[in-house]
């Protein structure tokens, strides 16, 4: 779990996301509260529940990006899911309990990587012995040492070897649950049960020495790691530090002015209630309590309003954060300020062809103006409009870059307006092209 202070979390998010200080502060405090809860006396720890967050803001302002960056910062099991993927229990589709199962898988992967790293040195030594066995056979000490020196020097990387690796696949293949796409694992994963019954099987793999290291180190690491303790730690991690980001929550809100059966929409909300409030979900690794999992819900709420959500669900998302629509100045900053901004990405892509791409200040102004103009006249899709416009402006350059090695291309306002000036001004054309 990360030990950043709220101020450090906000400054870290500022490196990648422009604006929205309130949303950044809310997620920073929520993340820090996870750290604080672990230091609270035992008798109070179970009583401290996370304050779930509802982010409200138009599309393309950075709600999902905040979640993505938070996932990297959190160093905790993190899952981002779209609420629209789920249906009410009893209908064809995935039910919301799958969220917790996926979170547990994420936690297991995290703990496995951490434990593998702890035994990596021993696993590498064992993997080296197995590669030498494949190259020289189990005996021949003198030849083995000569091969060991060559192996460590990298002289044998291209040599082909035959390895016996554990076959973890089930002899019966994947078993999907009918009517639930992707739900091949549940409380009883038959594939796993039968796979273990036929355990101890190996499979012959032909590969180069350099390609053999990764599977061998993984296999040797897993032999050194206590799998039961790993699962137990992962379940505890998911229960106490898990974070779930529920995107597109507005799409399962039923509008009050709409008549008709919205069964599966409202049903998803009703199914989410116990999950967010706190319940126990059965997974193939064991039961998981959701009382202390932090839920961050977000939605554009273009058509529905937050008040269209079930009152009980609104009550379970006590912290409300509103993200404002992006201004022209925000658009300009998005093009230049974030570490992996769009302009830098395009410059790096074209640099691989030997083309140097530069943008003047007035070109950046023209791009921001065009994005704001099209968002205002057609449909406001926020910062995503910049991608569309930039692709259109650089279309010709990207196409001919392979023939322009060594050239420097300067993009100025005249260049930008020459490519998209007429389109941005014509609402009918913008609808189809920008």
From Swiss-Prot:
**Pfam families per record:** AAA, AAA_2, ClpB_D2-small
In terms of domain of life, where is this protein from?
A: Bacteria
SMART domains referenced in this protein's UniProt entry, alphabetically: AAA, ClpB_D2-small
List positions binding ATP.
Answer: 18, 60-65, 247, 312, 384
Q: What are the record keywords, sorted?
A: ATP-binding, Chaperone, Cytoplasm, Nucleotide-binding, Stress response
The record, for CDD domains, names:
RecA-like_HslU
- For the keyword Cell wall biogenesis/degradation, the answer is no
Q: Which InterPro entries does the UniProt record give?
A: AAA+_ATPase, ATP-dep_Clp_protease_ClpX, ATPase_AAA_core, Clp_ATPase_C, HslU, P-loop_NTPase
Q: What cellular-component terms does GO give this entry?
A: HslUV protease complex
Task: Give this protein's Gene Ontology molecular function annotations.
Answer: ATP binding; ATP hydrolysis activity; peptidase activity; proteasome-activating activity
UniProt subcellular location:
Cytoplasm
An example GO BP is: protein unfolding
Q: What does this protein do?
A: ATPase subunit of a proteasome-like degradation complex; this subunit has chaperone activity. The binding of ATP and its subsequent hydrolysis by HslU are essential for unfolding of protein substrates subsequently hydrolyzed by HslV. HslU recognizes the N-terminal part of its protein substrates and unfolds these before they are guided to HslV for hydrolysis.
Q: HAMAP family attached here?
A: HslU
Q: Which family is annotated?
A: Belongs to the ClpX chaperone family. HslU subfamily.
Per UniProt, subunit arrangement is: A double ring-shaped homohexamer of HslV is capped on each side by a ring-shaped HslU homohexamer. The assembly of the HslU/HslV complex is dependent on binding of ATP.
NCBIfam families reported for this sequence:
hslU, PRK05201.1
Q: What is this protein called?
A: ATP-dependent protease ATPase subunit HslU
Recorded source organism is Phenylobacterium zucineum (strain HLK1)
Lineage, opening ranks: Bacteria, Pseudomonadati, Pseudomonadota, Alphaproteobacteria, Caulobacterales
Q: What is the gene name?
A: hslU
